[in-house]
Amino acid sequence: MRYIGCKTQLLENIKEVVFKHAKDAKSFCDIFSGTASVGRYFKQWFEVYSNDLLYFSYCLQKGTIECDKKPTFSRVKMELGIQSPLDFFNNMDSSSMEKLEQEKRFFQNNYSPKGGRMYLTDSNALRIDFARNKIEEWEKNKLLSKDEYFYLIAALVEGIPFVSNIAGTYGAFHKFWDARTAKRFCLIDLPVFTNKKNNLSFNEDGTQLLKKISGDILYIDPPYNERQYLPN
């Protein structure tokens, strides 16, 4: 995911430091998780506690860190005959999504040309809205477990930057269409590493959470500036 401060390219460097100085550690706490890339990576070796005050980050954590095995979506298969929710959303023709009510088109009404902005194309915004509403409908109808729900939300969130018309943050959009926006929006098939440990994800103020949990390794990667990350 393209996100300010993402540490994906530094994971091996962080691992080198961790294994050099904390050889006997059993747990790893990522108190400002962001894209959850660090916690997701260290789940291979540790029981992971992840946290972020931003709810989108919490969804990424719940869907890939606290969730300890790839969801099967058994109820969606049995009740709806949909073998793969990701294939269902990714392969559906955009014209089939036009039945979605206007009041449920949050992304199209606020972040596409139909809403006077150019963060997303109209068609990709509609694809996001359709998937988001359908996931909520399935959850309401008890067709999704908690892990399945958050996995799908995480898969949706992870796909948005790949079609967004931005330079790096959502503070502003390009005044022309970037080449990536021509691609069809797709939910991302996210890996889920099974470590059979009690991994936990939180959506709290990190300074307060540290008073309630304990662990061996504390990884701190706080915000870099005073600007709120949510608008980005």
What are these regions (language model features)?
Residues I14, F28-Y41, S50-Y55, G215-P231:
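Conserved proline-anchored active-site loop of SAM-dependent methyltransferases
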Residues N198-D205:
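Conserved SAM-binding strand-loop segment of SAM-dependent methyltransferases
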Residues K26-S27, E148, L152, N199:
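Residue-level recognition of the N-termini of beta-strands and the immediately preceding loop/turn
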Residues Q208-S214:
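Short conserved loop adjoining the S-adenosyl-L-methionine
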Residues E47, N51-F193, E226-N232:
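Class I S-adenosyl-L-methionine-dependent methyltransferase module
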Residues Q9-E16, L126-N133, E204:
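Short, contiguous clusters of charged residues that form electrostatic/catalytic patches at enzyme active sites
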Residues D24-S27, L187-K197:
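Short, basic, glycine/proline-bearing loop/turn elements
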Residues M1-F32, S37-W45, Y58-L60, C67:
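S-adenosyl-L-methionine
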